Amino acid sequence: MTELSLPRHWLFLRGLSRESGHWQPFVDDCAARLGWQCHTLDLPGFGSEHQRRSPLTIAEIRSDLQQRFALPDDEPFGIVALSLGGMVALDWLHTEPQRIRQLILINSSSGDCPVWQRLQPRALPQVFRGLVSRHISTQEQAIMKMVSNRHGNNAALLSRYVELRNQHPIQRRNVLRQLWAASRFRAPHTLPADRLLFLASRADHMVSWQCSQQLADRYQAPVALHQSAGHDLPLDDPDWLIQRFEDIAGKE
């Protein structure tokens, strides 16, 4: 894929229980270094949409985002998506292939992958802590330890994430509804390989990198593996990710 074939506009989608604020400063870095027009949308039930009920299917989440994405219908775009956001992106490409030029999927999965790879057993203690604790700081600390191999004890980052939670409270039922939607999602049978790039970390303690590998094999699409970052690759090694983005644009 050449630089000219890539879109100017890119939509960034987060995963389970996360919001657009968790992308920063990564999205701003992409805009500055790549010259992209970057957009973010919160999934229904989270972030700016926290007062809404989260749908029970990935297709409904995708449809909701389609209706809210303020871009002209004839303007092509790409999607950078993490984890559950990748499921939404795959479904979106399947339903609107004429608009979406490129998907970059980070540590994603689907119901076609074994359940112990979609949520690894070693992540379960932190998942449990995040769900049952009544204290936001304890919940966010558990999530950070689960998704990051480099910032699990970052006090400043924890403070920022707690502030996001205070601004946009999370309803436990919405987390469970997202989990249900993810568990039912099956990846489309066919998608154009030249519009797909899978990125994953071998050291992801939440979702096995093998899920990304299986999806890449399914579509005969390229995959690149990081050796040490955690599930939240944009947090753990943003430079590595941007270098991969530059690769598809033919930049050095």
PLM feature segments, named:
Residues 3-51:
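Conserved HGGG/HGGXW glycine-rich cap/lid loop of the alpha/beta-hydrolase fold
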Residues 37-78:
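Active-site loop/oxyanion-hole signature of alpha/beta-hydrolase fold enzymes
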Residues 81-85, 89:
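Gly/Ala-rich beta-loop-alpha elbow adjacent to hydrolase catalytic centers
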Residues 94, 103-132:
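Flexible "cap/lid" loop of the alpha/beta hydrolase fold
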Residues 136-189:
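Conserved alpha/beta-hydrolase catalytic His-Asp/Glu region
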Residues 192, 198-200, 204:
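Short beta-strand/loop motif that positions the catalytic acidic residue
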Residues 205-211:
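Conserved alpha/beta-hydrolase "acid-adjacent" motif
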Residues 229-242:
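Catalytic histidine-centered segment of alpha/beta-hydrolase-like enzymes
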